[in-house]
């Protein structure tokens, strides 16, 4: 997927109105995360919470992910939720991760819908088909974990009896599984609401991609956009632990746009560069939201949690 794409012609030729619309859709989709969170979080803690303010708080927390690997933005957001609304951090983190797992299952469904339209001719199609299958299985698996986290608790408890390294891994799995289980007793209606909000978020993300194509005067099949959104969202899981995700998002989107979108490799590379521009402009908006929540994020309790989340801090 190596492409020689000069970004300057992209910036010179892009239509700013459609680009701004794409950024707006991208930001709106991310803010809807607040509604998805409230659909799953225990009601006794969410009486004063509203979807859009919570969503802006989560999106503002993504600023921290620019400089630190791992789910630091998520930690910042749930610490801010505790500071602002009094919800226990463990409950907020569990509900957030649980909802994101369901979101990955919806991304897998979106990619699965586009699979029949993938061209498997040549190396690109084979890579897209094979990689897409793996990513879909990951998404479905994480969705299954979100519904039945009990097996993770049992596995973690068993591993704690092993060697030091396996014991530490088992302890982490057990704590994580117990956190998921703490909100995993929600009724099926709550799970369906989370899944519905996740699909809504995915649809707005696809709409952002479609308007970006209009900004670039690029014609792509809808199946390619669905495939790019589904596999791209799943590939970003790597980005939770490695800054930039080692190009997994770019590979997933380029492969999807070529294999199912009917565009050339160079046009797909151009689209990815423009998509990253949308992400950066969206993060600029998240910086504005961070400024609005600065008194919460910069409080001593939130800063303390972030220091504890830094790599090597507790080594």
Q: What is the role of each PLM region?
A:
Residues 61-69, 214, 230-250:
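Transmembrane alpha-helix interface/packing and boundary motifs in multi-pass membrane proteins
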Residues 60-68, 91-112, 235, 270-286:
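Membrane-embedded alpha-helical segments of transport systems
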Residues 75-80, 93-96, 106-108, 196-197, ...:
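Hydrophobic alpha-helical membrane segments of integral membrane proteins
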Residues 45-48, 59-76:
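Short intracellular "coupling" helices and adjacent cytoplasmic loop segments at the cytosolic face
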Residues 72-83, 113, 241-259:
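Re-entrant/interfacial helical elements at transmembrane boundaries that shape
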Residues 81-89, 228, 232, 250-267:
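Interfacial segments of multi-pass membrane proteins
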Residues 44-55, 76-101, 219, 258:
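Membrane-interface segments at transmembrane-helix boundaries
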Residues 1-59, 117, 121-237, 263-273, ...:
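Predominantly cytoplasmic-facing regulatory/coupling regions of multi-pass membrane proteins
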